[in-house]
Regions:
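Short glycine/acidic-rich loop motifs that flank beta-strands on beta-rich extracellular proteins
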Residues: 80-81
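N-terminal cysteine/histidine-rich coordination modules
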Residues: 1-12, 17-18, 23-46
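Flanking helices and flexible, charged tails adjoining ferredoxin-like Fe-S electron-transfer domains
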Residues: 28-69, 87-191
Length: 191
């Protein structure tokens, strides 16, 4: 079973600290020393707030990942139990966004050597002038693959709202639900 991270909405306060930690974890530079115009703020999770609840939405790393199955270029793969997007080969077709049942994938600008990458060979008509469009690629949670401390969002959450769901946690949850179900059934039989 693929591991994923989930946040408890009843604990989340919508502070977006997890989004900042995600950006820091995936940045090749110290964003705290950069001018705000130079920061590539592309978190791989999105905190959603409503009038009654807030929680981050992030990839569930599906077993039979619809995004991976939909990708015409094969850019989305299972890498060490993580559904991973190879942004270098992504063509920005957005098929994965349509396929994702959780809304966990965004399109972001592609960068190379700190500069926005332009689409190769695609020109657009801009008032009679030729211009080049920036290259956009898919972006989503990768569980901070390769990061020593694991997912950065979990490490910084002030309310400890995040938890890792892996096969052990899932098995414990199933056993607890079954236990509660038996208790409920036994109460029915005693009436």
């Amino acid at each position: 079973m693929n591991t994923f991270v989930v946040a408890a909405p009843h604990k989340c306060i919508g502070c977006r600290t997890c989004e900042v930690a995600c950006v820091v974890a995936h940045s090749d530079k110290n964003i705290f020393t950069l001018a705000s115009s130079k920061i590539k703020f592309y978190p791989r999770l999105s905190v959603i707030r409503t009038a009654t609840v807030s929680a981050p939405i992030q990839c569930r790393h599906c077993e039979d990942a619809p995004c991976a199955n939909a990708c015409p270029e094969g850019c989305i793969v299972n890498k060490e139990g993580v559904i991973y997007i190879n942004q270098k080969t992504c063509i920005g077709c957005k098929t994965c966004i349509v396929a994702c049942p959780f809304g966990a994938i965004d399109m972001v600008s592609s960068y190379e050597d700190g500069e926005k990458k332009l689409q190769a060979g695609l020109k657009c008509d801009d008032g009679g002038k030729l211009c080049f469009k920036e290259k956009m690629v898919a972006n989503k949670c990768d569980l901070c693959i390769g990061r020593k401390g694991g997912p950065a969002c979990m490490e910084v959450c002030p309310t400890d709202a995040f938890r890792i769901v892996n096969s052990d946690a899932m098995e414990r949850s199933i056993k607890e639900k079954r236990h509660q179900s038996v208790i409920g059934l036994s109460m029915l039989g005693s009436k």
